[in-house]
Regions:
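Membrane-embedded alpha-helical bundles of polytopic integral membrane proteins
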Residues: 2-206
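Functionally important transmembrane alpha-helices
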Residues: 210-211
């Protein structure tokens, strides 16, 4: 499983690097939109099972939201408000997980998908427009945290993190993932010339959301 995770991460990173650095920006940004729409298709499956009509409708719904945001993204307040909304959503989701499993109405599930997918696209597109290096670095935080948590958790995991939500995860794995991310942040601070005291807390926060 560990080898598979590392191999998947390396393949994904290689494909991503090709898309980000060797194709025109408009194509790279379009590829990110396609990725988000693929996520919308999968999310539609959670809502409607095997109903392709509902999945198509949900994919079009997310596509329309992304399109509207594309039109308005030159207004910095719009993008900032999307990120604020995403922050509120993820904090609310963390609270909701304390009461897991708790059923939610199907209509709210549609909204939850939009709150996951649309801000994700906005963040990926924003990072790419700053510099592709920064986008890859943020994705590396997630991948390194995942691989580090899996490796340490498999070898030393004893105390379960959240048995009802993800029985296989342990606190030892979390600490292993965060340690790996701190090392990545130290390297990133030199590459991007950012104070390590600033970058480490940022990377740890991102990793905490991912594990």
């Amino acid at each position: 499983m560990l080898k598979q995770r590392i191999l998947t991460a390396l393949i994904a990173l290689s494909v991503l690097a090709i898309v980000l650095f060797f194709v025109p920006p408009v194509v790279a940004r379009a590829a990110v939109v396609v990725l988000i729409l693929a996520g919308a298709w999968e999310w539609g499956g959670f809502l409607a099972g095997e109903s392709n009509g509902a999945r198509i409708a949900y994919t079009l719904f997310i596509g329309a939201l992304v399109g509207a945001l594309l039109v308005a993204q030159d207004n910095p307040l719009v993008v900032e408000n999307v990120f604020r909304l995403a922050l509120v959503w993820w904090l609310s989701a963390l609270v909701w997980m304390l009461f897991f499993p708790t059923p939610i109405p199907r209509a709210l599930t549609w909204v939850c998908g939009a709150l996951v997918l649309v801000p994700a696209w906005a963040a990926l597109d924003f990072l790419y427009r700053q510099t592709p290096d920064l986008l890859i670095f943020v994705l590396l935080i997630v991948w390194v945290a995942d691989i580090g948590a899996f490796f340490v958790g498999k070898g030393f995991g004893r105390v379960k993190l959240a048995p009802q939500i993800s029985p296989g995860k342990t606190w030892e794995g979390v600490l292993g993932g965060l340690t790996a991310v701190v090392l990545l942040a130290a390297a990133g601070s030199r590459y991007f010339d950012i104070d390590v005291a600033v970058l480490v807390p940022f990377c740890v926060a991102v990793a905490m959301l991912s594990v």
